[in-house]
């Protein structure tokens, strides 16, 4: 059973209705896993608002998915801020993750906006010293109490 190897599952849901997504989230949680959803740059938070109470994480894409090394879309931080506000107003428990174009400068913007989980593929794997880059990111996270 592959499920025993995972503690979470990310849903990317093009052209599906939220009741169907909620069914998938329920199945994921019944397997003892955490459920997350990815939000592409063109997708407004309003489209997933009715799912937020059930999610463990929301991933805000700051690039178009599928291609590494793209430029960080800073305007997507408005979604992060909106998710923080909704989480606080409704006592939701989800983490806010950012993926795409994250580097030593943009990671600060992510944390300052309210993200608490980061994906930084190209910035880490493309670094001359991967260990030093990871340590740099860890230090920045500490500065933001993450």
For the regions a protein language model found, what residue spans apply to each?
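Loop/helix-junction capping segments adjacent to catalytic residues or to phosphate/diphosphate-binding pockets
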Residues: 18-19, 45, 104, 127-131
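Short Gly/Pro-enriched loop/turn and capping motifs at secondary-structure junctions
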Residues: 64-66, 101-104, 124-125
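Conserved, mostly hydrophobic/aromatic
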Residues: 58, 83, 99, 110, ...
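C-terminal helical cap(s) of enzyme catalytic domains, especially alpha/beta-barrels
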Residues: 111, 125-146
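Acidic, divalent-metal-coordinating active-site segment for phosphoryl/phosphodiester hydrolysis
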Residues: 101-113
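Conserved anion-binding
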Residues: 1-95
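Expand to "…catalyze enediolate/carbanion chemistry for C-C bond making/breaking, isomerization
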Residues: 4, 34, 103, 131, ...
